[in-house]
Protein backbone atom coordinates (compact mmCIF):
# COMPACT_ATOMS: atom_id res chain seq x y z
CA UNK A 1 0.00 0.00 0.00
CA UNK A 2 1.77 3.15 -1.19
CA UNK A 3 0.94 6.61 0.26
CA UNK A 4 -1.55 7.37 -2.54
CA UNK A 5 -3.38 4.06 -2.02
CA UNK A 6 -3.33 4.74 1.73
CA UNK A 7 -4.97 8.12 1.20
CA UNK A 8 -7.61 6.63 -1.13
CA UNK A 9 -8.34 3.68 1.18
CA UNK A 10 -8.93 6.02 4.14
CA UNK A 11 -11.08 8.37 2.05
CA UNK A 12 -13.27 5.40 1.12
CA UNK A 13 -13.81 4.88 4.86
CA UNK A 14 -14.73 8.55 5.38
CA UNK A 15 -11.34 9.74 6.66
CA UNK A 16 -10.09 12.56 4.42
CA UNK A 17 -6.45 13.48 5.01
CA UNK A 18 -5.15 17.01 4.44
CA UNK A 19 -1.75 17.72 2.86
CA UNK A 20 -0.44 18.44 6.37
CA UNK A 21 -1.60 15.05 7.64
CA UNK A 22 -0.13 13.25 4.61
CA UNK A 23 3.19 15.00 5.29
CA UNK A 24 3.01 13.89 8.94
CA UNK A 25 2.65 10.26 7.84
CA UNK A 26 5.52 10.69 5.36
CA UNK A 27 7.77 12.16 8.09
CA UNK A 28 6.66 9.43 10.52
CA UNK A 29 7.77 6.75 8.04
CA UNK A 30 11.11 8.45 7.39
CA UNK A 31 11.88 8.88 11.10
CA UNK A 32 10.83 5.32 11.89
CA UNK A 33 13.25 3.90 9.31
CA UNK A 34 16.05 6.30 10.28
CA UNK A 35 15.81 5.62 14.02
CA UNK A 36 15.30 1.91 13.45
CA UNK A 37 18.93 1.69 12.33
CA UNK A 38 19.98 2.81 15.84
CA UNK A 39 17.39 0.92 17.89
CA UNK A 40 15.01 -1.95 17.33
CA UNK A 41 11.63 -0.25 16.80
CA UNK A 42 10.10 -2.47 14.12
CA UNK A 43 10.86 -5.39 11.81
CA UNK A 44 8.78 -3.66 9.12
CA UNK A 45 10.68 -0.94 7.24
CA UNK A 46 9.49 -1.19 3.61
CA UNK A 47 7.36 1.87 2.80
CA UNK A 48 4.35 -0.04 1.46
CA UNK A 49 4.47 -2.42 4.43
CA UNK A 50 4.69 0.41 6.98
CA UNK A 51 1.72 2.21 5.42
CA UNK A 52 -0.34 -0.98 5.46
CA UNK A 53 0.74 -2.88 8.58
CA UNK A 54 1.45 0.06 10.87
CA UNK A 55 -0.47 3.13 9.68
CA UNK A 56 -3.57 1.64 8.05
CA UNK A 57 -3.79 -1.17 10.60
CA UNK A 58 -3.66 1.33 13.49
CA UNK A 59 -6.32 3.57 11.97
CA UNK A 60 -8.61 0.62 11.14
CA UNK A 61 -10.09 0.94 14.64
CA UNK A 62 -11.68 4.21 13.49
CA UNK A 63 -13.70 2.35 10.83
CA UNK A 64 -15.72 0.76 13.64
CA UNK A 65 -15.36 3.15 16.59
CA UNK A 66 -16.20 6.87 16.48
CA UNK A 67 -13.09 8.66 17.76
CA UNK A 68 -14.80 12.05 17.61
CA UNK A 69 -16.70 10.97 20.75
CA UNK A 70 -13.49 10.57 22.78
CA UNK A 71 -11.32 13.23 24.37
CA UNK A 72 -8.58 11.31 26.23
CA UNK A 73 -6.77 8.17 25.09
CA UNK A 74 -4.11 6.07 26.79
CA UNK A 75 -2.00 3.66 24.72
CA UNK A 76 -0.34 0.93 26.79
CA UNK A 77 2.92 -0.47 25.41
CA UNK A 78 2.76 1.59 22.23
CA UNK A 79 6.27 0.72 21.06
CA UNK A 80 6.90 2.95 18.04
CA UNK A 81 3.58 4.75 18.60
CA UNK A 82 1.02 2.27 17.28
CA UNK A 83 -1.95 2.53 17.24
CA UNK A 84 -2.29 5.88 19.04
CA UNK A 85 -0.11 8.22 16.98
CA UNK A 86 -1.58 7.38 13.54
CA UNK A 87 -5.01 7.82 15.18
CA UNK A 88 -3.87 11.15 16.68
CA UNK A 89 -2.75 12.38 13.24
CA UNK A 90 -6.22 11.61 11.85
CA UNK A 91 -8.06 13.00 14.89
CA UNK A 92 -5.96 15.96 16.14
CA UNK A 93 -8.41 16.87 18.94
CA UNK A 94 -7.45 13.77 20.94
CA UNK A 95 -5.33 14.08 24.08
CA UNK A 96 -3.01 11.08 23.95
CA UNK A 97 -0.96 9.48 26.73
CA UNK A 98 1.51 6.72 25.88
CA UNK A 99 3.02 4.37 28.46
CA UNK A 100 6.06 2.25 27.65
CA UNK A 101 8.69 0.60 29.82
CA UNK A 102 11.60 1.12 27.41
CA UNK A 103 13.37 4.46 27.80
CA UNK A 104 14.88 4.45 24.31
CA UNK A 105 11.42 4.17 22.73
CA UNK A 106 10.34 7.21 24.74
CA UNK A 107 13.27 9.15 23.27
CA UNK A 108 12.12 8.25 19.76
CA UNK A 109 8.49 9.13 20.48
CA UNK A 110 9.48 12.50 21.98
CA UNK A 111 11.51 13.37 18.89
CA UNK A 112 8.75 12.10 16.61
CA UNK A 113 6.01 14.18 18.27
CA UNK A 114 8.19 17.27 17.99
CA UNK A 115 8.99 16.62 14.32
CA UNK A 116 5.31 16.01 13.45
CA UNK A 117 4.14 19.03 15.47
CA UNK A 118 1.79 16.92 17.60
CA UNK A 119 0.27 18.70 20.62
CA UNK A 120 -1.53 17.18 23.63
CA UNK A 121 0.66 14.08 23.47
CA UNK A 122 2.33 12.87 26.67
CA UNK A 123 4.81 10.04 27.14
CA UNK A 124 5.32 8.12 30.37
CA UNK A 125 8.30 5.86 30.94
CA UNK A 126 6.73 3.34 33.30
CA UNK A 127 5.54 -0.22 33.73
CA UNK A 128 1.82 -0.56 32.98
CA UNK A 129 1.32 -2.26 36.37
CA UNK A 130 2.72 0.76 38.23
CA UNK A 131 1.02 3.30 35.98
CA UNK A 132 -2.37 1.65 36.58
CA UNK A 133 -1.99 2.24 40.32
CA UNK A 134 -1.11 5.92 39.85
CA UNK A 135 -4.07 7.99 41.07
CA UNK A 136 -3.35 10.71 38.51
CA UNK A 137 -4.12 8.22 35.73
CA UNK A 138 -6.21 5.45 37.23
CA UNK A 139 -9.77 5.47 35.81
CA UNK A 140 -9.11 8.78 34.03
CA UNK A 141 -9.27 7.86 30.32
CA UNK A 142 -12.21 7.75 27.89
CA UNK A 143 -10.44 5.09 25.84
CA UNK A 144 -7.48 2.80 26.44
CA UNK A 145 -5.89 0.96 23.52
CA UNK A 146 -3.57 -2.01 23.18
CA UNK A 147 -2.21 -3.48 19.98
CA UNK A 148 -0.01 -6.03 21.61
CA UNK A 149 1.03 -9.66 21.58
CA UNK A 150 0.19 -10.22 25.28
CA UNK A 151 -2.85 -12.37 25.97
CA UNK A 152 -6.17 -10.61 26.37
CA UNK A 153 -6.45 -11.65 30.03
CA UNK A 154 -3.09 -9.96 30.73
CA UNK A 155 -3.91 -6.87 28.66
CA UNK A 156 -7.20 -6.52 30.55
CA UNK A 157 -5.40 -6.33 33.90
CA UNK A 158 -2.93 -3.76 32.55
CA UNK A 159 -5.45 -1.59 30.72
CA UNK A 160 -8.86 -1.78 32.42
CA UNK A 161 -7.75 0.06 35.60
CA UNK A 162 -6.97 3.13 33.44
CA UNK A 163 -10.41 3.27 31.80
CA UNK A 164 -12.92 5.61 33.45
CA UNK A 165 -16.34 4.19 34.30
CA UNK A 166 -18.43 4.38 31.13
CA UNK A 167 -15.27 4.47 29.00
CA UNK A 168 -13.93 1.79 26.67
CA UNK A 169 -10.98 -0.57 26.30
CA UNK A 170 -10.12 -1.25 22.67
CA UNK A 171 -8.22 -4.48 21.99
CA UNK A 172 -6.65 -4.97 18.56
CA UNK A 173 -5.72 -8.55 17.76
CA UNK A 174 -4.68 -10.63 14.77
CA UNK A 175 -5.89 -14.22 14.31
CA UNK A 176 -7.29 -16.67 16.91
CA UNK A 177 -8.75 -13.88 19.01
CA UNK A 178 -11.98 -15.74 19.78
CA UNK A 179 -10.12 -18.40 21.74
CA UNK A 180 -8.25 -15.70 23.68
CA UNK A 181 -11.48 -13.94 24.51
CA UNK A 182 -12.95 -17.08 26.06
CA UNK A 183 -10.00 -17.43 28.45
CA UNK A 184 -10.12 -13.68 29.23
CA UNK A 185 -13.82 -13.42 30.07
CA UNK A 186 -13.28 -14.01 33.79
CA UNK A 187 -10.58 -11.30 33.96
CA UNK A 188 -12.59 -8.78 31.94
CA UNK A 189 -15.56 -9.17 34.27
CA UNK A 190 -13.38 -9.01 37.41
CA UNK A 191 -11.80 -5.72 36.27
CA UNK A 192 -15.21 -4.14 35.65
CA UNK A 193 -15.57 -4.71 31.93
CA UNK A 194 -18.18 -6.06 29.55
CA UNK A 195 -17.48 -7.07 25.94
CA UNK A 196 -19.70 -4.74 23.94
CA UNK A 197 -18.71 -5.32 20.32
CA UNK A 198 -16.46 -7.48 18.15
CA UNK A 199 -15.42 -6.56 14.61
CA UNK A 200 -13.59 -9.03 12.36
CA UNK A 201 -12.09 -7.93 9.06
CA UNK A 202 -9.12 -8.46 6.74
CA UNK A 203 -6.35 -6.01 5.97
CA UNK A 204 -6.44 -5.04 2.29
CA UNK A 205 -3.77 -6.34 -0.11
CA UNK A 206 -2.53 -9.24 2.01
CA UNK A 207 -5.93 -10.25 3.45
CA UNK A 208 -4.58 -11.04 6.93
CA UNK A 209 -7.17 -11.43 9.68
CA UNK A 210 -7.78 -8.67 12.21
CA UNK A 211 -10.08 -8.42 15.23
CA UNK A 212 -11.18 -5.43 17.26
CA UNK A 213 -12.95 -5.83 20.61
CA UNK A 214 -14.67 -2.96 22.36
CA UNK A 215 -14.94 -3.58 26.12
CA UNK A 216 -17.05 -1.12 28.11
CA UNK A 217 -16.16 -0.32 31.72
CA UNK A 218 -19.36 -0.78 33.73
CA UNK A 219 -17.87 -0.66 37.25
CA UNK A 220 -14.66 0.33 38.99
CA UNK A 221 -11.66 -2.01 38.98
CA UNK A 222 -10.87 -3.46 42.45
CA UNK A 223 -7.99 -1.52 44.04
CA UNK A 224 -5.58 -4.46 44.15
CA UNK A 225 -5.36 -4.58 40.35
CA UNK A 226 -3.10 -4.33 38.49
CA UNK A 227 -0.84 -6.50 40.62
CA UNK A 228 2.93 -6.01 40.97
CA UNK A 229 5.09 -5.71 37.81
CA UNK A 230 5.48 -9.07 36.10
CA UNK A 231 2.70 -10.81 38.04
CA UNK A 232 -0.11 -10.39 35.46
CA UNK A 233 2.09 -12.07 32.86
CA UNK A 234 3.29 -14.88 35.13
CA UNK A 235 -0.06 -15.58 36.78
CA UNK A 236 -2.82 -14.42 34.41
CA UNK A 237 -6.38 -14.48 35.72
CA UNK A 238 -8.15 -17.03 33.52
Curated annotation (Swiss-Prot):
This is Ribosomal RNA small subunit methyltransferase G. Specifically methylates the N7 position of guanine in position 535 of 16S rRNA. Pfam families: GidB (PF02527). SUPFAM superfamilies: S-adenosyl-L-methionine-dependent methyltransferases (SSF53335). CDD domains: AdoMet_MTases. InterPro entries: rRNA_ssu_MeTfrase_G, SAM-dependent_MTases_sf. Keywords: Cytoplasm, Methyltransferase, rRNA processing, S-adenosyl-L-methionine, Transferase. S-adenosyl-L-methionine binds at residues 77, 82, 128-129, 147. GO terms for molecular function: rRNA (guanine-N7-)-methyltransferase activity. The gene is rsmG. One of its GO terms (cellular component) is cytosol. It is an enzyme of class 2 (transferase). The lineage of its organism: Bacteria, Bacillati, Bacillota, Bacilli, Bacillales. Its EC number is 2.1.1.-.
